[in-house]
């Protein structure tokens, strides 16, 4: 084997080994891992590991026969099950297949995701009814969180969506939300969010 072929083989072996290590890290973590933490653990530079992550994502996300995929969210990576298999995963975990949100919670969530940061009073005004229990349910489900306080008397809480919201709805960021114009057929929802 020539020196050039030996170097290429060595580089391929190194990449395969690092991809294997990264897969293991993502698997055992169960939580999103920051790219900088992966770099620190495998002792490689940011750009190199970022390229490896892209390759791994292409492998997992491009193969329809696999039941898992890698998602990227705000500079973190996580190994998750594919949405199409959620029904079966839920059966294994013996949870309700659908832990549905009430209409009030869905309305509140729609308003928060399009108008954030927003106060409870502003949500109440848009909906025309009290939203406190709906917002509390969204907070309990980790879809919404306190993002700060409005600098006015009483300093009301500002609400916004969480990374869990993005993961739950398979969004990379809020820019992936459907345009509000898509909801124009449902004037009630459109009017609530546009107010």
From Swiss-Prot:
Keywords: Cell cycle, Cell division, Chromosome partition, Cytoplasm. It is found in: Cytoplasm. It comes from the Bacteria. Gene3D superfamilies: Winged helix-like DNA-binding domain superfamily/Winged helix DNA-binding domain (1.10.10.10). GO terms for biological process: cell division; chromosome separation; DNA replication. It holds the Pfam family SMC_ScpB. Transmembrane segments: none annotated. One of its GO terms (cellular component) is cytoplasm. The keyword Cell division applies. Participates in chromosomal partition during cell division. May act via the formation of a condensin-like complex containing Smc and ScpA that pull DNA away from mid-cell into both cell halves. Homodimer. Homodimerization may be required to stabilize the binding of ScpA to the Smc head domains. Component of a cohesin-like complex composed of ScpA, ScpB and the Smc homodimer, in which ScpA and ScpB bind to the head domain of Smc. The presence of the three proteins is required for the association of the complex with DNA. PANTHER family: SEGREGATION AND CONDENSATION PROTEIN B (PTHR34298:SF2). Belongs to the ScpB family. This is Segregation and condensation protein B. It comes from Clostridium perfringens (strain 13 / Type A). The lineage of its organism: Bacteria, Bacillati, Bacillota, Clostridia, Eubacteriales. The gene is scpB.
């Amino acid at each position: 084997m020539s020196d050039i072929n030996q170097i290429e083989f060595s580089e391929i072996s190194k990449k395969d080994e690092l991809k294997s290590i990264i897969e293991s890290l993502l698997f055992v973590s169960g939580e999103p891992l920051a790219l900088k933490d992966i770099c620190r653990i495998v002792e490689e530079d940011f750009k190199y590991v970022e390229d490896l992550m892209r390759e791994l994502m292409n492998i997992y996300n491009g193969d329809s026969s696999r039941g898992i995929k890698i998602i990227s969210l705000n500079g973190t990576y996580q190994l998750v099950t594919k949405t199409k298999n959620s029904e079966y995963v839920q059966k294994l975990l013996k949870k309700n297949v659908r832990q549905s949100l009430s209409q009030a919670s869905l309305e509140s969530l729609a308003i928060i995701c399009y108008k954030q940061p927003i106060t409870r009073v502003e949500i109440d005004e848009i909906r025309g009814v009290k939203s406190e229990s709906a917002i509390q349910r969204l907070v309990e489900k980790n879809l919404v969180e306190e993002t700060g306080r409005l600098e006015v008397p009483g300093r009301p809480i500002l609400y916004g969506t969480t990374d869990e919201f993005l993961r739950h709805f398979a969004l990379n960021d809020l820019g992936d939300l459907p345009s509000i114009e898509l909801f124009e057929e449902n004037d009630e929802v459109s009017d609530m969010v546009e107010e």
